[in-house]
A protein has these predicted regions:
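Hydrophobic positions on the alpha1 helix immediately C-terminal to the Walker A/P-loop
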Residues: 16
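Hydrophobic anchor at the beta1->P-loop junction of P-loop NTPases
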Residues: 5
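Conserved glycine(s) of the Walker
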Residues: 12
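Conserved substrate/cofactor phosphate-moiety recognition/catalytic segment
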Residues: 21-76, 137-139
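ATP-dependent NMP and nucleoside kinases share a basic, alpha-helical "lid"
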Residues: 100, 104-164
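Extreme N-terminal, non-catalytic leader segments
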Residues: 1-2
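Conserved P-loop NTPase mechanochemical-coupling segment
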Residues: 81-103
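P-loop (Walker A) phosphate-binding loop of NTP-binding proteins
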Residues: 8
Length: 164
């Protein structure tokens, strides 16, 4: 069984995730900002060529970036908030490569989200803010999606998950 913990800021999501991780130690826990098979919040999603440029630009912390990076086809996911550095502007620079906050067209955003859920195979996992919070917020704020459009998005996603 998988657990998806959702809620507004301050509602106790992290506390509940911590309790579930203690109660079910065999579960893999994905907190917001971790590398997750389904969620990309607080992660930069870049092409291989842009990734190489980032490694060159931040050569002094290259090892830290590589330790917090994951290959996904022609892209790399950098969990940049996990990189502890005092380099001015590093986190702000990588933030621009998140898929949220209207940085991508809605079609590209949808393609990435659906692809991640279609390719996810797993059980015994606990996810924080991975199914609704970031996706719904982004859909409400940037393409200004209506309630019916958001529900349609999730209906289509559910159908695609059933096909897996």
């Amino acid at each position: 069984m998988n657990y998806f913990i959702e809620g507004i800021q301050g509602s106790g999501k992290s506390t509940l995730v911590a309790k579930l991780s203690k109660r079910y130690p065999s579960c893999t826990v994905f907190r917001e900002g971790d590398y997750s098979p389904v969620e990309l919040a607080w992660c930069a999603y870049v092409t291989k060529s842009r990734y190489a440029e980032i490694l060159d630009q931040y050569y002094s912390i290259r090892d830290l970036i590589e330790e917090n990076s994951y290959a996904e086809g022609d892209h790399r996911v950098i969990c940049y908030t996990k990189v502890i550095t005092d380099i001015p502007g590093f986190h702000k620079d990588l933030e621009q490569y998140e898929i949220y906050n209207g940085r991508l067209s809605f079609d590209e955003f949808r393609r990435i989200v659906f692809h991640r859920y279609e390719n996810w195979i797993g059980d015994d996992m606990v996810f924080e803010c991975s199914l609704f919070q970031n996706i719904v917020e982004d859909m409400m704020l940037y393409p200004n999606a209506s309630d019916s459009e958001i529900l349609g998005f999730y209906r289509e996603l559910a159908v695609k998950r059933k096909e897996v």
